[in-house]
Amino acid sequence: MRLTDIEIEQALDNGTIVIEPRPGIEAISGVSVDVRLGGQFRVFKDHTAPYIDLSGPSVEMQAALDRVMSEIIEIPDGEAFFLHPGELALAVTYESVTLPADIVGWLDGRSSLARLGLMVHVTAHRIDPGWQGKIVLEFYNSGKLPLALRPRMTIGALNFERLNHAVARPYNTRKSAKYKDQQEAVASRISQD
């Protein structure tokens, strides 16, 4: 069952769910809690790579990813990152989130932003039980105009579901967890599959 605003507040109060910095009461409504945009981004660099072989040898795949992804781009508070039509960028939430082994989270973009063409979380919107860290956002501008994204703007909302039982392998205890404890806009680690 999805947690209500009352249950979310209780989970934050008793430490079952941890969101740092803790959101104010105005950020919690209905069945969700707002999250804000952090100041770190990554983009695809200009490159001549004809493709990335997603099922090729890990070493070659990682080399291709290293060639095409930028380093972290830091955007100070008050300044903007511009996402142009047809561009993909990685970003990170301002908040860090910790979930117990019996709660799964879901991240949804804001409808008001989607109506301007901004996809906030292209496909991976599940936050696994046992997650700890910031959430990487996969932005895509499907609109017609560049969009100015500023650190700390409200970018999406998290909602939570309590599971019938705790999972046997919470995310942060799995050796295969590629994005464990992430604190920045981490690029794809598909080569580690």
From Swiss-Prot:
Lineage top rank: taxon: Bacteria
Pathway given in the UniProt record: Pyrimidine metabolism; dUMP biosynthesis; dUMP from dCTP (dUTP route): step 1/2
Reaction(s) the record says it catalyses: dCTP + H2O + H(+) = dUTP + NH4(+)
GO terms for biological process, alphabetical: dUMP biosynthetic process; dUTP biosynthetic process; nucleobase-containing small molecule interconversion
Protein name, per record: dCTP deaminase
EC number: 3.5.4.13
Active site (record annotation): E138
Function: Catalyzes the deamination of dCTP to dUTP.
PANTHER family: DCTP DEAMINASE (PTHR42680:SF3)
Phylogenetic placement of the source organism: Bacteria, Pseudomonadati, Pseudomonadota, Gammaproteobacteria, Alteromonadales
HAMAP family (UniProt xref): dCTP_deaminase
GO MF: dCTP deaminase activity; nucleotide binding
Oligomeric and partner information: Homotrimer.
Region of interest (Disordered), ranges: 174-193
Family to which this protein belongs: Belongs to the dCTP deaminase family.
Organism: Shewanella baltica (strain OS155 / ATCC BAA-1091)
Pfam family, one: DCD
Binding residues for dCTP: R110, S111, S112, L113, A114, R115, D128, V136, L137, E138, Y171, K178, Q182
